[in-house]
Structures are given as structure tokens and as C-alpha cells.
Amino acid sequence: VADKIDWYLANPLTRRERRLGRSPSAWARSFACEDVSVLIVCRGPIRMEAMDVLDEMGVARYGILLSDKDSIVYQQARAPELRRMDAARVHRVRDYSGATTAERAERVADIVAICKAHGYGYVFAGYGFMAESADFVAALEDAGLRFIGPCSHTQRAAGSKDEAKRTALAQGVS
């Protein structure tokens, strides 16, 4: 009987060495990111996927952010990402974005404070309301943090369709 092959694990397009620091190429090693520290600010499957990618890339220092609502729900759901996390890397905020402008500013300040207190230099927000907020990204940039995604200037320029079209044309991508 021939051995069964797990095509997902054997697929070189999805399963390959992603730790660039181990590459024989000096050029590839220059892109190594094992020394970055990331706070993941998104939910569910996207958070789990980000954790998997960071693990594959050799990023050992990352934490996740939970809202109070997530903290209650996830204790009942036994989310897989929480089962494998050191509790010191799970951080909480009241909610992710707040209902008012003042609450949003307070939440962003909470996220910045968590990053500073725990040594996270990067923030990954997946996609959606936080990842697409130029104000959120600008606040991170102003605090000396790096956002994994488009910078606030790009987000603002792309925020309006006609400005996005002009930006794309100016960059030669449309």
C-alpha cells in the first residue's frame, strides 16, 4: 500500500520555509522579521490566520487584543487561538472602537498604551473598521508604532473614490 500524501502539507505554494532569516541569500535575509513584535487587533479566523502566518515567519513575540465582549464569549467558545496563547500576551480593552468620537480616541489611546507597555512595535488589524481607519493608523504612527498595512496618508488618499483614482493614475497602477 502506497503512503498517503497530505497534499496541503506537501504543497510548496502554501507550505514552505517562511523564516527569511534562515535563507542562504543575504538579500532574502535582509527581509527577515523574526525580531518584530506585533499586537493583533482583529477577531476570530482572521486573528487565527495572522497568528499562523507570524508563527510560520518565525515571529515569536506577538499578542492579541480582546474586547470585553470577546473575553466573555471566547471563554465559553474555547477559541483555539486562546488555548495556545500565554495569558500574558492576551490584552483587553472595553471595546475595539467605541460608540462616540471621544470613546474612539480613548480606545486608540488604550491600544497605544498596551503596545508601549508590552513592547509591541507593530499593529496588525486584519481588515474592516479599524484597518481602514486613517485616524487609527495616524494615531499609531504619531505614537511611533508601525501599522501593518497602508499608511494613514494612503488610506486618506484612497478614502474618496475620485482621489483614489487620481492616486492610482499618478502611481501608474490604473
Language-model-detected regions and their locations in the chain:
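N-terminal beta-alpha lobe that positions the nucleotide/phosphoryl donor
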Residues: 1-174
